[in-house]
Amino acid sequence: MTAPKTDRRILRTRALLRQGLAELMQEKNAGDITVNELVAHANVNRSTFYLHYTDIDQMLASVEAELLERIEASVQAHPIDPHQAQIFPLVGDLFALMAENREICAALLGPHGDMAFLLQIEAILSRYSLQVLADAYPDRRADLDSGYSFCLSGCVGLIKNWLQAEEPAPPEVMAQRTYRLIHNAMRGLCPGVEA
């Protein structure tokens, strides 16, 4: 049985609110944005906002939860096999997801974003990648931790830069670059470990 479809008007309203939130978060922290400010910016009635969300914090939590759910689904769809260098499909999916949600991802990962959101993404990636590698190479844990931290920080910087770019490279190009950087870094930092 398929899930019931959401009314187009609801989807449109949520998209307007989400876009408005992303635009306002380019200027200020979500905690400093009022419902009145958001609905005026998004050109949506205040009462309509309250049909969907209780406040800005709940809206932000809802948007983040949806994105985290999709990130986790992508990671689960492409399990990491430490003996096969097959992370490219996962990296491709993650860049496609971010491209599809560019404005809100740029806001969440930008200077006025939510550090907790980034930490949750890191936890998902760690749970599904670092742990698999650590289980496969228990005697290399220190090397893996260093390599993973290096790659993760580099990827976060690369993603932030890409999301803020005026003329960003296509997601497929970014996925290829990122994969190459991860693969080369892990090979250099952890000889004998495939990433």
What are these regions (language model features)?
Residues L24-Q58:
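Helix-turn-helix
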Residues V75-I104:
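Hydrophobic alpha-helical connector segments
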Residues T34-V35, V63-E72:
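Short, basic, alpha-helical segments at the C-terminal edge of helix-turn-helix-like DNA-binding modules
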Residues P89, H112-Y137, D145-V156, H183, ...:
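Amphipathic alpha-helical packing segments from all-alpha helical-bundle domains
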Residues A134, S153, N161-A195:
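C-terminal peripheral helix-coil segments that are non-catalytic and often amphipathic
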Residues G20, H52, S62:
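Residues in the recognition helix of alpha-helical DNA-binding motifs
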Residues M1-K28:
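Basic, helix-initiating cap at the start of DNA-binding domains
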